[in-house]
């Protein structure tokens, strides 16, 4: 049996302010830093050890991973960062308050933008300063790879090749792996692992800073999955994520 740990970054400053974040490089809030520290301690207490780690290229995921590995005395293990693990790109919604956006466009429309599988938010203009082509960390990407907006289907399409080509072979080889990423990039992977339908994925909410453990067979098919920690706190955290886009 193989184990994989997925961890959504700790609360970011824009999570705290209930704003659409996407690819904007916002740091952790004070609460988020504490969540990351608690996640690392919990993993250590539960006897987890990792051989390698993966993160997005956004600081809220990177800092969460740093903190977790520091707590576990594993800062020496190899860490690979990839834009393919980035949060879903929220297009022109990035920076907007979710509640105010729901008041303007309606709860139903915002729920579609946030949670539907194949409906992207309005796109950023190519000359918008928020467009990823303006950020040098993406300088090596082709124009076709750079999103101006994404739906979850798009996020799946960029994440899964990286999973199959880079991460999965390491797990198959016996490496113990942690992936620290984002709500929607992790939803994309969970959708694939658990074979969740396009319709049912709408109801999946991944809370910040709580480790999600997958036990996998030799073909990397899930045997079971579970969150570590207090289950009542988990339920509250998932409900809070679900309510974020309501007026």
From Swiss-Prot:
The active site is at 9 (tele-phosphohistidine intermediate), 87 (proton donor/acceptor). The record marks 182 as: Transition state stabilizer. Substrate binds at residues 8-15, 21-22, 60, 87-90, 98, 114-115, 183-184. InterPro entries: His_Pase_superF_clade-1, His_PPase_superfam, PG/BPGM_mutase_AS, Phosphogly_mut1. Keywords: Gluconeogenesis, Glycolysis, Isomerase. Pathway: Carbohydrate degradation; glycolysis; pyruvate from D-glyceraldehyde 3-phosphate: step 3/5. Signal peptide: none annotated. One of its GO terms (biological process) is glycolytic process. Pfam families: His_Phos_1. Its EC number is 5.4.2.11. It catalyses: (2R)-2-phosphoglycerate = (2R)-3-phosphoglycerate. PROSITE patterns: PG_MUTASE. GO terms for molecular function: phosphoglycerate mutase activity. Catalyzes the interconversion of 2-phosphoglycerate and 3-phosphoglycerate. NCBIfam families: pgm_1, PRK14115.1, PRK14120.1. PANTHER family: PHOSPHOGLYCERATE MUTASE. Belongs to the phosphoglycerate mutase family. BPG-dependent PGAM subfamily. This is 2,3-bisphosphoglycerate-dependent phosphoglycerate mutase. It comes from Chlorobaculum parvum (strain DSM 263 / NCIMB 8327) (Chlorobium vibrioforme subsp. thiosulfatophilum). The gene is gpmA.
